[in-house]
Design a protein with these regions (language model features):
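Conserved phosphate/ATP/ADP-binding segment of small-molecule kinases
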Residues: 87-170
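Short, charged, surface-exposed loops that flank catalytic or proteolytic processing sites
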Residues: 121-130, 198-209
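Short pre-catalytic strand/loop immediately N-terminal to key active-site residues, enriched for Gly-Thr
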Residues: 170-183
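Short, small-residue alpha-helix embedded
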Residues: 180-203
Length: 247
């Protein structure tokens, strides 16, 4: 069962104009403490977009309240893309996000986020040896596993590059690249990965599943001319998940 701890309620996703947003920062810690008082035990905590430094700090505290020694801590440091921070974040925001990253078992930045977290100048054309150096530097913050998303493996292939510092081991996996962009693919990837981990898959197998399932969802979505506005139509691809899990 999923237990949702909302940080905000939006009338639509951020590609829509003039959306309404209700900030729920003040409720994060009270909800976490209430769950703790009711002896709620979590197998995993997965965090995504956080709208302010205060939210990041409160989620760090919520992890301390909710996570036990065996709880998976999965952090998607969603704050930037294309070489720039998202609108509303100042240049100090990555410093706050680094505190949350330090608590993670698995962290899944894109290249922009990895560069911001490590103080590395952003470039789109880093080769694999340089990307490995960035992951090593990011691992110094404290996460057990670092997964770089959106890694190009040639003009027709896109995937992930993962690093486990305790073993000084890298893992590469790519799948077919599709020339399309939809909101929510990062959330979809992370959710599929967490789900696979909760089903007992090792991280490398979970990453393969997440990459392949995200590709399937994009392929399905490309058939719908209205899809770019509403996001990835993952519901139509859910029937493929049992097959992916059994591989």
């Amino acid at each position: 069962e999923c237990a949702i701890l909302p940080t905000a309620v939006l009338s639509a996703h951020t590609m829509f104009p003039d959306i309404l947003c209700r900030d729920l920062t003040a409720d994060i810690l009270p909800i976490a403490r209430y769950w703790r008082s009711q002896q709620v035990q979590l197998d995993a905590v997965y965090t995504g977009y956080l709208a302010s430094p205060r939210q990041v700090e409160d989620v760090c505290q919520a992890l301390e309240v909710l996570a036990g020694p065996d709880t998976l801590r999965f952090v998607d440091p969603a704050m930037a893309d294309g070489g720039a921070l998202y609108t509303g974040f100042d240049e100090d925001f990555p410093r706050h996000m680094a505190r949350l990253v330090a608590q993670a078992d698995v962290v899944t930045p894109n290249l922009t986020e990895a560069c911001l977290l490590t103080g590395t100048p952003y470039r789109e054309d880093y080769d694999l040896p340089r990307l490995r150096d960035i992951l090593r530097k990011l691992a110094e913050l404290g996460p057990r596993h670092v997964v770089l998303t959106g890694v190009p493996y040639g003009p027709d292939k896109l995937g992930v590059l993962a690093y486990t510092p305790a073993e000084d081991r890298f893992f590469e996996y790519g799948s077919r690249r599709i020339d399309a962009h939809f909101p929510g693919t990062g959330d979809l990837f992370s959710s599929a990965c967490v789900g696979a981990l909760m089903r007992g898959k090792p991280l490398e197998e979970a990453l393969r599943l997440a990459v392949d399932f995200t590709l399937l969802c994009i392929q399905v979505t490309c058939r719908d001319e209205n899809a770019p506005w509403y996001g990835v139509e993952f519901e139509k691809a859910l029937r493929y998940l049992p097959e992916l899990l059994e591989r």
